[in-house]
């Protein structure tokens, strides 16, 4: 190893130590962007009749270790307050999120006492009970509430309330760029509406853009779709699985949030099986369908492309949803 390579390895290890992430995340040598060859260019003609390969989605052999590093209150434009929890894990180097509705659901890893931390440290990272206000001194004592963290958790356990949960993968195009190619943005909004009506629940927001292939590959897939392929064919032409996502991190996050029994908002049967974990650490007691708003006679996304997208999910990916008659 020459000096330059040695300096790069030292830099990678130092960065990973700062992030508290495993070294194998950065074990592969980085290449300058000009030296990277495009290895995923489609080698087949568009619009071929391709059978999907087995998906990567499935039950993990082990669950990753997760840790909630910060929690913050977010007032929303809908009037509902949520608590945004940011997680790190030993499976990937992404910052996954838990959008928590209500104050009954708490993170065990967040509430755990860290060596040497002060009361201010705990409040700054969100490990407090009740609400923050100017002049507050203790993370454990809120003058507006007499309940401790453990009392809040015990109260939640006694209610036997099974929360609504949505496992949602990031979709920049559908959530931010107003795309009518998919209904991801609508599903996220609808999940938030349903959970806020009940008062307590969780949206696990995974950074798995494009069913796990990333935004750049997803945009290539869009171009292949414009050439006549459906979403599954486009992924396969780019040498990706039809669905490359993993839900192991989501399972571990739910466990950290104390949610062992859930009602899952999904049309995807593979997600139901995967989220329960290798040893049934989480139990899906009910699956609740996510029916497009326009299919229910409400104002929602109306485009030929979103219909084809959903039709492909039903016919090629086994999603449990009935196409409308018209």
From Swiss-Prot:
Gene Ontology terms: cellular component: cytosol; nucleus
Pathway: Cofactor biosynthesis; riboflavin biosynthesis; 5-amino-6-(D-ribitylamino)uracil from GTP
Coarse class of the protein's main subcellular location: cytoplasm
GO molecular function annotations of the record: cyclohydrolase activity; GTP binding; GTP cyclohydrolase II activity
Pfam families, per database record: GTP_cyclohydro2
Catalytic activity: GTP + 4 H2O = 2,5-diamino-6-hydroxy-4-(5-phosphoribosylamino)-pyrimidine + formate + 2 phosphate + 3 H(+)
Keywords, comma-separated and alphabetical: Cytoplasm, GTP-binding, Hydrolase, Nucleotide-binding, Nucleus, Riboflavin biosynthesis
Top EC group: hydrolase
Matching InterPro entries: GTP_cyclohydro_II, RibA, RibA-like_sf
Keyword Ribosomal protein among UniProt keywords: no
Presence of keyword Cytoplasm: yes
Enzyme Commission number(s) from the entry: 3.5.4.25
Localization terms from the record: Cytoplasm; Nucleus
GO biological process, any: riboflavin biosynthetic process
Matches recorded under NCBIfam families: PRK00393.1, ribA
Similarity annotation: Belongs to the GTP cyclohydrolase II family.
Name this protein carries in UniProt: Probable GTP cyclohydrolase-2
Gene symbol of the encoding locus: rib1
